[in-house]
Amino acid sequence: MPELDASQFPFAVPAAAIAREAGALLKSYYERGVTAEFKGDVDIVTEADRASEKLIGERLRAVFPQHGVFGEEGTRQQLDSEYRWYIDPLDGTTNFAHGFPYFCVSMGLEHRPAGTPVDADGVIVAGVIYEPLRDELFIAEKGKGAYLNGRQIHVAPTAMLQESLIATGFPSRKRHESPNIHFYQEFTLRSHGVRRAGAAAVDLAYVACGRLEGFWEFNLNPWDTAAGSLLVTEAGGEITRFDGSPFLLDSHEVLATNGKIGKEMRTLFADMFAGRNVSPIPTPEEFKKRRDEAAAKEQ
């Protein structure tokens, strides 16, 4: 596996080592099983979440003592610092607890220069996502590209939604005010397929490396999206809110695409939010015509 130079990636490389250590810890818990506690309708936490967050917090303090840490499981340290890490020590806890092998460690670094208003976002400058069961390490630093196990990655070139594999997630609160089932149905009918695997950070990483062309979800938190949002943009993709406005850490919604199907997805969102009848599902002949027209444009 090619190794990235720590002098060129001063934030991501040390964070990657921490993510690997946390991932090894999670893997050990996964192999022996854990007990889950409910903290909402379906949202759970395990001893593995807490142990991973504790380890990450301790390692970050040792390597970056001036940095703040904001963790899903309650860690709040030096939040007035110029640099702030958003960490999800175990994204995909429900999967983990059930033995479903789709989860990760996610760490995103926000830079907040002096004078940044309290209620304004800084800039995400580094992101690390590690899948321990697959031993896949995604990293990015702003302006330097995105990488999977040391090799640069790019979003998929697919130009049409009908040929795209996309993903989504469902809120961890059963009574969330914007249920996603209607959107899931419409996008399933208009894409090559929709996947719902249960770990937003992994889904964003998969958009970045071209395994998915798009991903959308409601009710997310900064620790879910900080790392993945940078991976997507550094891999050449696009990340916005559903209406096309800029994505912010506290947006609570995300639409990440390869940059080619985003407009088509946003148009569908606009129609569905407005209660308008969406266009009929194209016939096979219409699908072929669209495909031929797209191919002609690329020539």
Q: Whereabouts are the PLM-identified features?
A:
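N-terminal subdomain of lithium-sensitive/metallo-dependent phosphomonoesterases centered on the IMPase/IPPase/PAP
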Residues: 1-90, 260-267, 274-299
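Small-residue (primarily alanine) positions within well-ordered alpha-helices
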Residues: 15, 19-22, 52, 127, ...
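DPxDG-like acidic metal-binding loop motif
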Residues: 79-149, 162
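Generic detector of well-ordered alpha-helical packing
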Residues: 50, 54, 73, 89-92, ...
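Residue-level signal for inorganic ion chemistry
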Residues: 26, 49, 60, 93, ...
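An extended, acidic
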Residues: 154-299
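Solvent-exposed alpha-helices and their adjacent loops that cap or buttress functional pockets
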Residues: 37, 77-79, 117-121, 139, ...
